[in-house]
Curated annotation (Swiss-Prot):
Highest taxon in the source lineage: Eukaryota
Positions of ATP binding: T29, L30, G31, P32, D86, G87, T88, T89, T90, G413, N479, A480, A481, D495
GO cellular component terms given for this protein: cyanelle
Family: Belongs to the chaperonin (HSP60) family.
InterPro entries, per database record: Chaperonin_Cpn60_CS (IPR018370), Cpn60/GroEL (IPR001844), Cpn60/GroEL/TCP-1 (IPR002423), GroEL-like_apical_dom_sf (IPR027409), GROEL-like_equatorial_sf (IPR027413), TCP-1-like_intermed_sf (IPR027410)
Record's subcellular location: Plastid, Cyanelle
Quaternary context: Forms a cylinder of 14 subunits composed of two heptameric rings stacked back-to-back. Interacts with the co-chaperonin GroES.
Protein name per the record: Chaperonin GroEL, cyanelle
Enzyme Commission code: 5.6.1.7
UniProt catalytic activity: ATP + H2O + a folded polypeptide = ADP + phosphate + an unfolded polypeptide
Keywords for this protein: ATP-binding, Chaperone, Cyanelle, Isomerase, Nucleotide-binding, Plastid
GO biological process, one term: protein refolding
NCBIfam families: GroEL, PRK00013.1, PRK12849.1, PRK12850.1, PRK12851.1
Organism phylogeny: Eukaryota, Glaucocystophyceae, Cyanophoraceae, Cyanophora
Species name: Cyanophora paradoxa
Amino acid sequence: MAKQILYHESARRALEKGMDILAEAVAVTLGPKGRNVVLEKKFGAPQIVNDGVTIAKEIELEDHIENTGVALIRQAASKTNDVAGDGTTTATVLAYAMVKEGMRNVAAGANPMAIKRGIDRATQKVVETIAAHAKPVEDSRAITQVASISAGNDDEVGKMIADAIEKVGKEGVISLEEGKSTTTELEITEGMRFDKGYISPYFVTDPERMEVIQKDAMFLITDKKITLVQDLVPILEQVARARKPLFIIAEDIEKEALATLVVNKLRGNLNVSAVKAPGFGDRRKAMMQDIAVLTNTQVISEQTGLRLDSIKLDVLGKARQVNITKDYTTVIAEGNEEGVSARCEQIRRQIEETDSAYEKEKLQERLAKLAGGVAVIKVGAATETEMKDKKLRLEDAINATKAAVEEGIVPGGGTTLAHLAIELENWVQSNLEHEELIGGMIVARSLTAPLKRIVENAGQNGAVIAEQVKDKPFNIGYNAANAQFVDMFEAGIVDPAKVTRSGLQNAASIAGMVLTTECIVVDKAESQQKAASVNRNSFDY
């Protein structure tokens, strides 16, 4: 395919144009008075969302060069989502502000490499300062506040997530399910999560989120490698007749057997998924036994005299729901309370008897996984469109809460970054020089961008409010919901330090890359290629 090549300023301007389109589409959702965005879907009803990364993933432009700009800024949102699970809109707004500010200086003749070094050093300074200002999360009130803000100022949801964390612990698993009613409910159930994802992406049932979701699934657990497809055929036929999903945990599944499972899945003959067994050695056997107790099943093993090719359906266990991503598996069990409590008691005795600190730690980890259970939030809504939006908000709230527990909280609503802008300006002028100083000042000027946008979305003058916030003490910020200056901690307007930090780091990384771009090579648009071929063929020989 023919390529189009752009150099220097025109290359950077084309990237900026694409970034402008995406940043504006995402920025309208920021803050308590942020608006929604409607996404057209090829199939089904349009989706109404308020989630930055979901909007960013949907935007695809006709112009290949502008689309490259979109892809770059989308990366800032995606990476922030991967690290912190929230703060994607803030990351996008920051990245665009830094690029816009930096473009002016590069166009005026500043050295982009020196500017990038200045941006990196200034960002590192802000990250350290955020960590110094972060307050640890010690009570459920703080957890409620963080969750409420991330769920779009929904206090009920915040309280529900705080309850869930209180019941399953800070390391516990919180799962989202589609409810049957219009109200959102919390339920604590037996279940566990382990660090193994699907063996093949062909098992995925939700391509948008790259997840496998199986409801009312049958469980097959074996401690051997499944090499021959003949071993699986008898049980697969029985499961197909029962018309139930099948979930397999095995030491490994070799190519031939895996190919058979994938083909049957793709043809719709069988709803099947498989993961490798977690852990290794004796720990692997113990963990498989834990899962077997949880799902009321038997481990198919030579030691117990059970063979894969001769088992019946009554040997298989059951789970209410299985969620599998590329990294981990969550099992929500169907209630084998007696078996689970007996197994927990057994593990407790082992903890008392062992002298090894490592062994003790691993046994406690197993006990926490088995006894902690899973908090299931059943999302209720009147329509499917509302349900999807609610699920995205809840997901953000859960991620933000876990991030807050990890690294503490700071004043929210763009306040922290706005206050740190003054501190950073002073540090930059004392510690950086020449074009590195310009890079540092780019970061300092961009730090107020999220606050300005939150205020503008609420219908006020962003620049004026940002200057007023800078003059006030660190905890004082602007509450855009009621247009008042308040103590952000007292008002419950807080952000997880991890979200603020990772958003800034990813924004600075993308801005540095864009500013140091000198050439773009992209595919030529089809219309241009056709025009070129018409011109070539129009000579009069």
